[in-house]
């Protein structure tokens, strides 16, 4: 669903920011 996709994208972005 759109909500799940949004959550996955947000999670990936958050993880990316933490790893930077």
Curated annotation (Swiss-Prot):
User: What is the recorded name of this protein?
Assistant: DELTA-actitoxin-Afr1d
Q: Name a biological process GO annotation.
A: monoatomic ion transport
Where does the UniProt entry say this protein principally localizes? Answer: secreted
Q: Which organism is it from?
A: Actinia fragacea
Q: How the protein assembles, per its UniProt entry?
A: Octamer or nonamer in membranes. Monomer in the soluble state.
Q: What is known of its domains?
A: Composed of a long N-terminal alpha-helix and a core region rich in beta-sheet structures. Before the pore formation, the alpha-helix binds the lipid membrane, partitions into the lipid-water interface and stabilizes the monomeric molecule on the membrane. Finally, it traverses the bilayer, thus forming the transmembrane pore.
| Function (record text) | Pore-forming toxin (PFT) that consists of a crown-shaped octamer or nonamer that forms cation-selective hydrophilic pores of about 1.5 nm (inside) and 13 nm (outside) and causes cytolysis. It causes cardiac stimulation. Also causes hemolysis (HC(50)=0.4 nM). Interestingly, the Phe-16 is crucial for hemolysis.
UniProt entry keywords in alphabetical sequence: Cytolysis, Ion transport, Lipid-binding, Membrane, Nematocyst, Secreted, Target cell membrane, Target membrane, Toxin, Transmembrane, Transport
Extract one GO molecular function annotation from the record: lipid binding
The note filed under miscellaneous reads: This protein has been found to bind carbohydrates, since it shows a substantial delay in elution profile in size-exclusion chromatography. The carbohydrate pocket ovelaps with the lipid-binding module of actinoporins.
The UniProt entry's sequence similarity note says: Belongs to the actinoporin family. Sea anemone subfamily.
The source's superkingdom equals Eukaryota
Q: Does the keyword Secreted apply?
A: yes
Annotated site, Part of the hydrophobic cavity (in subunit A) that receives Val-60 from the adjacent subunit (B), chain positions:
16
Location comes to: Secreted; Nematocyst; Target cell membrane
Keyword Ion transport, does the record have it?
Answer: yes
CC terms in the record's Gene Ontology section: extracellular region; membrane; nematocyst; other organism cell membrane
Q: How does activity depend on temperature?
A: Stable up to about 47 degrees Celsius.
């Amino acid at each position: 669903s759109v909500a799940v996709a949004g959550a996955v994208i947000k999670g990936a972005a958050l993880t990316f920011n933490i790893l930077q």
